[in-house]
């Protein structure tokens, strides 16, 4: 996965939106908004996959003309975009870029049967990254997010990049 190119694409998209909408805000406001957007996208990812809906027999929402797998991939990539944007806004790109070397190792991780604890840990670390300005917590949250996509959801690097 070309994480450098994905970061550049995320930053470009964000700048395009800001220019088109004529948004003028402080860096703090921009960062705060990106964290909220990521939180919402992660919730949408969970809601789309429906792993936590133990009462349902058939899990996984789908958009018209898409499979549940394609719909979930779309939500996953939306969330990834905000991780990448935050890494740039907070000058934490090195955490994302360092993870490039560990992708093969992450792909060897054990698939979780119940994603609840992993999801809550990912969100807890994300909130710690925001409230305590912790790059290490961001790094851990990012790596759990990669595991979700590459292991627990079973996407390939190519699927995620495309």
Predicted segment positions?
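Flexible "arm" and connector segments at domain edges
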Residues: 1-162
């Amino acid at each position: 996965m070309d994480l450098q190119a994905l970061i550049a694409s995320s930053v470009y998209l964000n700048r395009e939106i800001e220019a088109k909408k004529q948004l003028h805000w402080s860096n703090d406001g921009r960062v705060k908004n990106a964290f909220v957007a990521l939180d919402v996208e992660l919730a949408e990812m969970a809601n789309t996959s429906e792993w936590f809906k133990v009462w349902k027999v058939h899990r996984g929402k789908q958009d018209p003309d898409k499979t549940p797998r394609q719909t979930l991939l779309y939500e996953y990539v939306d969330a990834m975009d905000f991780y990448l944007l935050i890494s740039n806004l907070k000058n934490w790109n090195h955490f994302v870029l360092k993870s490039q070397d560990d992708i093969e190792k992450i792909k060897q991780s054990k698939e979780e049967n119940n994603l609840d604890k992993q999801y809550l840990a990912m969100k807890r670390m994300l909130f710690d990254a925001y409230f305590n300005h912790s790059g290490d917590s961001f790094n851990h949250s990012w790596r759990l997010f990669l595991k979700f996509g590459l292991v627990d959801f079973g996407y390939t690097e190519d699927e995620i990049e495309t």
